[in-house]
Amino acid sequence: MIENVSVCDLKMSKDLEEIENEIFTTAWPSETIKQKINNKEFKYWVYKKNDKLVAYLGVQFINDFIEILGIGVIEEYRKNGIAGELMNELLDFFNKSSYLKIILEVRESNDTAKNLYTKLGFNKISKRKNYYKNED
């Protein structure tokens, strides 16, 4: 079940922080997430399973494009198409919007994410050297 996080869902900021801490080496603190949820320039989609938050997708709106800030699925729910479902929600939103493009950053070693983005029609346009800490 996919839900849109809105201002009234600030209680989810702690859950989003926990998911980020589980998945990523550097995570946004819950206060930063709260600020983003309260800001119309950001949007979060969350995926719940049995009322448990198991995945999210966060974006920022910048001028005429959407930047994917993060997408994550907790380990026990991976390989079930959840990230793809969240991305399809974003693509549906994008197709109904006036935004011109979607951009994202992905770690060079993250083949799973790169495969998903390629499958969804994203193209590599450039590479930022030394963007990620501890890149392998």
Language model: regions and residue ranges:
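Acetyl-CoA-dependent GNAT
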Residues: N4-V5, L10-E76, M87-E89, F93, ...
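A short, internal acetyl-CoA/4′-phosphopantetheine-binding micro-motif in the GNAT/acyltransferase core
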Residues: I71-K79, V106-S109
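Acyl-donor (CoA/ACP) binding surface of acyl/acetyltransferases
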Residues: E76-N80, G84, I102, R128-K129
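Short glycine/proline-centered loop/turn elements that form peptide/ligand docking sites
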Residues: A83, M87, S109-A113, N130-E135
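Structured catalytic core of nucleotide-sugar glycosyltransferases
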Residues: F93, A113, I125-K127
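Conserved GNAT acetyl-CoA-binding A-motif
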Residues: F94-E105
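Conserved catalytic-core motifs of GNAT/GCN5-like acyltransferases
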Residues: E105, N123-D136
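Conserved active-site tyrosine of GNAT-family acetyltransferases
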Residues: Y117, F122
